[in-house]
Amino acid sequence: MSRKNQAPKREVLPDPLYNSKIVTRLINRVMLDGKRGTAATIVYYAFSAIKEATGNDALEVFETAMDNIMPVLEVRARRVGGSNYQVPVEVRPERRTTLGLRWLVNASRARGEHTMKDRLAKEIMDAANNTGASVKKREDTHKMAEANRAFAHFRW
């Protein structure tokens, strides 16, 4: 592995339809095998289905869903005196978004609807209503952090 400097972070361009960087990141998360066009079609169809079902702006529903999914705390393993402790730490903003998108897409893929378009739309709507597997994942993460609160003094 190279010992040179860390590669610079590449700027994510906003998507053409909603002019939003987080939508571009969602498209990149949904994308499989480099098929960005297919991923964009899935996301845009899901957004149109959300607008149809709720009557609200799809981007607002998506942002509400992301606020409900993104974790504030998580646990990290820390080795102290020969034993591992799960230490609760705050999540940095960039990682919050990344985890939220990851959990949203994974929960969508695990759903039972017929197409990915429908799965994604339903999961986003569920997350906006504080239900669904992605919100449960966040709650589980927060519960773990709360349960290990006694080890918070090991934070680094």
From Swiss-Prot:
Keywords: Ribonucleoprotein, Ribosomal protein, RNA-binding, rRNA-binding, tRNA-binding. One of its GO terms (biological process) is translation. Signal peptide: none annotated. Coiled coil: none annotated. Pfam families: Ribosomal_S7. The keyword tRNA-binding applies. GO terms for cellular component: small ribosomal subunit. One of its GO terms (molecular function) is rRNA binding. InterPro entries: Ribosomal_uS7, Ribosomal_uS7_bac/org-type, Ribosomal_uS7_CS, Ribosomal_uS7_dom, Ribosomal_uS7_dom_sf. Belongs to the universal ribosomal protein uS7 family. Part of the 30S ribosomal subunit. Contacts proteins S9 and S11. One of the primary rRNA binding proteins, it binds directly to 16S rRNA where it nucleates assembly of the head domain of the 30S subunit. Is located at the subunit interface close to the decoding center, probably blocks exit of the E-site tRNA. This is Small ribosomal subunit protein uS7. It comes from Streptococcus pyogenes serotype M12 (strain MGAS2096). The gene is rpsG.
